[in-house]
Amino acid sequence: ALLSMLVILPFLGETIFYSKGEPREAIVALSMLESGNWILPVNYGTDIAYKPPFFYWSIAAVSSLFGEVTEFSARFPSALAFLAMQLMFFAFVAKRKNVQTAFLASILLLSSFEVHRAAVACRVDMVQVAFIVISLCLLFRWDEKGCRGVPWLAVLLMGCATLTKGPVGSIFPCACIGVYQLLRGRSFWKAFFSLVGIGLLSFVPYL
């Protein structure tokens, strides 16, 4: 985690926005701070942003600490999401394999080009992926414990993923764990009803 912080955080503000997508995301957060409208923010002063608001909320919250929206503050949520995902992934692998394997997996994750690019960009992808990956790890742990109770933290994170880029943030983790359970011999209907309930709970913030 320390290596990832040293590789990513110091360089977030070193380059200006280099694609059309980055300023398009940042301008929505800027409009939130200027207008005070955090529910229906606008893009370029007139168009209502068509993506769910969680990523924009993140940029606006970080930028409010700095006093303005900058390249650093706009990219920081993506970097923070990556670091959280990497820590969770390390803990997940270390518990089921060993620390050496977890460390190697973390280095491979950090050195993956597309993952690194998403971690230093002002785009929704890294935040959504982090929520999905962490949710998958939590759902896997829930499955290991016999699917007892409701995995509330996974539900919360899937809800955040849904608020970041739509229903795929809940559907994908539930579908992955559902397929895994079927391959492990669990009956279709038991897997279906338990995961549908979890998925519906995670949709509550989206409504």
Which stretches of residues belong to each language-model region?
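Membrane-integral, polyisoprenol-dependent glycosyltransferases
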Residues: 1-207
